A protein has these predicted regions:
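Surface-exposed, charge/polar-rich loops and edge strands
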Residues: 1-322
Length: 322
């Protein structure tokens, strides 16, 4: 019952009007916790401090209603996401931020300081993160056996929002130490949440003696289950070339094939990039690399460097660029 009232879905998947309606109709919607200026009623212009205070008040209302049930002990949670026929099951817990310092947590993206600062203020004033940092690590048979055993039971939470099914189980106390040991066996890689990570680190720097700022919420998925959906970029062509000249420039990075529609441009293999330009769809297959390492071989890095940077002339990591 509470899941239907509290769980709000992805913030960016809703328009400001939809989020505003959810906040007005449901005082327990988590959109009320993460509200921004665009969610305010028309004609009102709340300050950042007022928005954060309203978010903190909404969270207090949810907690006072006992919508969240504490486990009563340190615990991990098994978390399964199901979407479009794909399941992935991970472990939710508190990630110690020292891992960013000693190389146990690896990142691959720059962050925009203004957004990290905004999330940092939210963390300090509201006192909660809206969603976990998503991590991946090498699959492990021992950890999988524990999760398989845990998820064989009826889930404690089973909720669907926006066609995504979420299920949660509490890992048994007897398995907690074994799960912790397996999670610490290898480095983890941030797949989503670089700004949330930066915000958490900034909070720790401002509150070095507060243990609540020494860790942050995270979920870890095994590498053989994790699926990363498309993250589209809208980038200008600095040279403003006609489509044929642009295709010629793209061809310096790989093979370009014009396709009929967006489905034809959807990447289905590693090294493929869908391109929409001048009302036409193309599939770009990046040339093989002579030398590869863990970072430069990532499709997202090759797209940033070879296509957005080299061809379009846009530095995606420039925090001052639009």
């Amino acid at each position: 019952e509470w899941a239907k009232r509290v769980v709000a879905g992805a913030y960016d998947s809703k328009t400001p009007e939809e989020r505003r309606a959810a906040i007005e109709d449901n005082p327990y919607s988590y959109f009320g916790v993460t509200r921004s200026a665009s969610d305010a009623p028309p004609g009102t212009y709340p300050t950042d401090a007022e928005l954060l205070a309203a978010g903190a008040a909404t969270l207090s209302r949810i907690l006072d209603a006992e919508a969240f049930v504490p486990t009563g002990r340190p615990a991990f949670y098994a978390y399964r996401i199901s979407f479009a026929g794909h399941d992935q099951t991970g472990v939710v817990g508190a990630l110690h931020l020292d891992g960013f310092d000693d190389g146990r947590v690896l990142t691959h993206e720059n962050v925009r300081p203004d957004r990290a600062e905004m999330l940092g203020r939210h963390l300090e004033v509201v006192g909660a993160t809206s969603s976990p940092i998503s991590l991946t690590l090498l699959a492990d048979p021992t950890r999988k056996e524990i999760l398989d055993r845990t998820t064989a039971a009826v889930p404690e939470l089973d909720h669907e929002v926006e066609r995504v099914r979420h299920r949660v189980w509490t890992v048994a106390e007897a398995d907690t130490d074994a799960v912790a040991a397996r999670l610490n066996a290898n480095p983890v890689f941030v797949t989503d949440g670089h700004h949330r990570s930066a915000a958490a680190l900034a909070g720790r720097a401002r509150h070095p003696d507060d243990p609540t700022f020494a860790r942050t919420l995270a979920v870890v998925f095994p590498h053989d289950e994790v699926r990363v959906e498309a993250f589209h970029r809208r980038a200008p062509d600095r040279d403003r070339r006609p489509v044929d000249a642009l295709v010629t420039a793209l061809a310096t990075t790989g093979t370009v094939t014009e396709v009929d529609d967006a489905d034809g441009a959807h990447p289905r293999e590693r090294g493929q990039v869908g391109v929409y330009a001048h009302g036409r769809w193309f599939l770009l297959e990046l040339d093989p690399q002579e030398r590869q390492d863990a970072l430069t071989s990532l499709d997202v890095e090759r797209l940033r460097r070879d296509v957005i940077g080299h061809v379009l002339g846009v530095d995606e990591l420039d925090t001052d660029s639009d």
